[in-house]
């Protein structure tokens, strides 16, 4: 079964999907979906790699694992489906976006418009059990998403990596900083946002770098849904 992702990513990831560890992960995941409530739904697991093709990635915003509440996760880091209340981290992201670029806080929490402009919203672990944060940690997803990061690092075209919090910053060693650009700050979670996430202006920093590279900037402001 081919994972539901963009053809350009399929070409990049195909050999990874043939590895024995991935076959084990797949079998384990089948059993998890059969016996547990798991988020996101199977078709959305690779949504980040479906909406943003390999060649078009300009920015990576690295998350940890999906939201574990009903109806929240849909395969994009920090993003929630329309109609779902903004989780605390996303609320803080929107607050910083407003302070940084003056973007009004949207009436929904879907970041699909970012993904469609080349922002890869990647969690390092792609699934989670309902109500159990980090429940799928250490099962093999980290190897999959490390390969995604490595593939982007191999590209000649520069990528901006946005690393919020220690978990994301642990991936720094995989990134060639002579070629790519890293923006880091504390995590937007309520536990750490006041320790340096607020006021860090990541969105304008990303755009300044893209402009310097001669690349089209991201329109970070998100339209309300009627």
Curated annotation (Swiss-Prot):
GO terms for biological process: base-excision repair, AP site formation via deaminated base removal. SMART domains: UDG, UreE_C. InterPro entries: UDG_fam1 (IPR002043), Ura-DNA_Glyclase_AS (IPR018085), Uracil-DNA_glycosylase-like (IPR005122), Uracil-DNA_glycosylase-like_sf (IPR036895). Keywords: Cytoplasm, DNA damage, DNA repair, Hydrolase. One of its GO terms (molecular function) is uracil DNA N-glycosylase activity. It is found in: Cytoplasm. Transmembrane segments: none annotated. HAMAP family: UDG. Excises uracil residues from the DNA which can arise as a result of misincorporation of dUMP residues by DNA polymerase or due to deamination of cytosine. This is Uracil-DNA glycosylase. It comes from Bacillus pumilus (strain SAFR-032).
């Amino acid at each position: 079964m081919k994972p539901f992702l963009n053809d350009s990513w399929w070409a990049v990831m195909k050999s990874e999907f043939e590895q024995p560890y991935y076959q084990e992960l797949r079998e384990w995941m089948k059993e998890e979906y059969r016996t547990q409530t798991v988020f996101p739904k199977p078709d959305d697991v690779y949504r980040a790699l479906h909406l943003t093709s390999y060649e078009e990635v300009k920015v990576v915003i690295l998350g940890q694992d999906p939201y574990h509440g009903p109806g929240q996760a849909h395969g994009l880091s920090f993003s929630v489906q329309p109609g779902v209340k903004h989780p605390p981290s996303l609320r803080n992201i929107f607050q910083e976006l407003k302070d940084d670029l003056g973007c009004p806080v949207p009436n929904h929490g879907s970041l699909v418009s970012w993904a469609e402009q080349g922002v890869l919203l990647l969690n390092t672990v792609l699934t989670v059990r309902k109500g159990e944060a980090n429940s799928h940690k250490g099962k093999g997803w980290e190897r999959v998403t490390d390969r995604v990061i490595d593939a982007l690092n191999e590209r000649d075209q520069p990528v901006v990596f946005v690393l919020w919090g220690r978990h994301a910053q642990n991936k720094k060693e995989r990134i060639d900083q002579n070629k790519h650009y890293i923006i880091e700050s504390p995590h937007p979670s309520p536990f750490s946002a006041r320790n340096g996430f607020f006021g860090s202006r990541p969105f304008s920093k990303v755009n300044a770098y893209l402009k310097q590279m001669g690349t089209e900037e991201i329109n970070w402001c998100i339209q309300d849904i009627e």
